[in-house]
Design a protein with these regions (language model features):
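Alpha-helical transmembrane segments in multi-pass membrane proteins
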Residues: 9-71, 127-128, 233-241
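Juxtamembrane helix-loop-helix connectors linking adjacent transmembrane helices
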Residues: 30-50, 71-143, 149-150, 154-155
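N-terminal juxtamembrane cytosolic/stromal segments of multi-pass membrane proteins
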Residues: 1-9, 71-87, 254-263
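Transmembrane helix-loop-helix hairpins at the membrane interface
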Residues: 4, 8, 126-262
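Short hydrophobic alpha-helical membrane-anchoring segments
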Residues: 16-35, 67-71, 102-111, 174, ...
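Alpha-helical transmembrane segments
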Residues: 3-21, 57-60, 92-102, 163-168
């Protein structure tokens, strides 16, 4: 348990250091490139030009975390208990329920015109969000599941203790997700908690970070903002079918895709 807390503290130290360094460099860049008396349109254009810079900083943070946790074997990418011959089947079936639920969630939010996106996500295009998807998927899986939950499992902690610990550790990220009015984004927090519960359960069964990387990345490919009601209805129907079918397939197929415990 102590190791899991130490991993979290180490991750926070590296993550915050990257943020402070990135914030300093971005602030310096804008200070040097914004002339005095600039119009708001010029400032907005300059803010858009720093997105690639922020993405580079994000990937730099990934490299730092990967080197630290990989070099000292705190975490690693592996298939875990998944049989290698069944890896593609496992990736598909494990992804179906959370992908379907995400489709249902986004379709309901858009069909009922509910404001659930933080301002930062509203300003980013679908393709522009992909790098952040990669960064977020890596951090979530490599640190919170591959290092922290893995250590909790090795310590013999019960599943509810694992989930409670992960929820507390991820809480600061949920607090940072605010609506345009400045309130805590309850909708995305609920989606994040449900995703956390599902991914924690999948990891406890498979012990596979590779499966979870695919799961996180694919579920984040669902378009989160659209105006077409037809698309919303189609996503709602397809998402419901994927969720129900995915859980049914998991209950039947998951045990046969895992290595049998020796005991």
């Amino acid at each position: 348990m102590l190791k899991a807390i130490l991993y979290y503290i180490l991750f926070l130290a590296e993550y915050l250091s990257t943020i402070f360094l990135g914030g300093f460099l971005v602030g310096l860049y804008m200070a040097l490139n914004i002339p005095s008396g600039s119009h708001s349109q010029q400032i907005e254009g300059l803010e858009e030009s720093i997105y690639p810079f922020m993405i580079v900083i994000g990937f730099l943070g990934i490299l730092i975390v990967w080197f630290t946790f990989g070099h000292y074997k705190f975490s690693r990418f592996s298939l875990g208990k998944v049989i290698p011959a069944a890896k593609w089947k496992a990736m598909t079936i494990c992804t179906m329920p959370i992908l379907g639920f995400t489709m249902v969630f986004y379709s309901i939010m858009n069909l009922f015109h509910l404001d659930f996106l933080p301002k930062q996500m509203m300003d980013i295009s679908y393709l522009g969000f992909l790098p952040y998807n990669i960064i977020g998927s890596f951090i979530s899986v490599y640190i919170f599941f591959g290092a922290i939950q893995e250590e909790l499992i090795r310590c013999g902690k019960k599943r509810w203790v694992q989930l409670l610990t992960l929820s507390i550790m991820i809480l600061p990220a949920s607090m940072m997700s605010a609506t345009p009015s400045g309130d805590i984004n309850v909708d995305l927090t609920v989606l994040g908690f449900i995703s956390l519960c599902y991914c924690s359960w999948i990891y406890s069964k498979t012990r596979s970070t590779i499966i979870l990387i695919v799961l996180y990345f694919v579920s984040n490919l669902v378009p989160f903002q659209f105006e077409s009601k037809v698309l919303g209805i189609l996503l709602l129907i397809a998402g419901t079918a994927l969720t129900i079918g995915g859980f049914a397939a998991l209950s039947r197929k998951l045990p046969e895709m895992l290595v049998k415990d020796e005991d």
